[in-house]
Amino acid sequence: MREAKRAAARRGRRLRIMFVDEARFGRMNRIRPCWAPIGTRPEVAAQLIREYIYLYGAVSPKDGICVYLIMPTSNTACFQVFLEVLARKFARQDILLVLDGAPNHRCSDLAVPNNITLLYLPPYSPELNPKENLWDEIREKVFKNYALKSMDAVRAKLKQAILYIERNPKLVRSITSFPYIVNSL
């Protein structure tokens, strides 16, 4: 991280620290607890249709800014597109991108844009990535107990989730500002 800060300073640019991850969303819903009147048992439709799309996301815990991209799958080509979107969105800044060691994040075919530096988390440590908490928030607040009839409905729900997160930077900061992150900034 120190090297990334020095490199950004040499180039006269601001360093933005972001955490990235991807999550799978689809028609196979997970039933979650919910409130119901006393004496009644809530009914929730369930289905076992295995169709999925992926939501790539990056979060800046310092200011709560997020970037999302809906993709058909999770592979190196999709991750490459996401990196290019990030690089363009923050073209005047350097980005230290903290991520897990998934194979599509480490592929030799991956061309990392000039303003992005990758920093890998230790293996098997999703608890260190605050982006994971945002996936929980999306699943709890937007996808809770829905049986979606089509992949278009899943996409529409994802767009609703993106708007919910992007409109609430204060919430994002409260979910993602882990002490070890805030103290290092």
Predicted regions and their residues:
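Short functional hotspots at interaction and active-site rims
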Residues: M1-L185
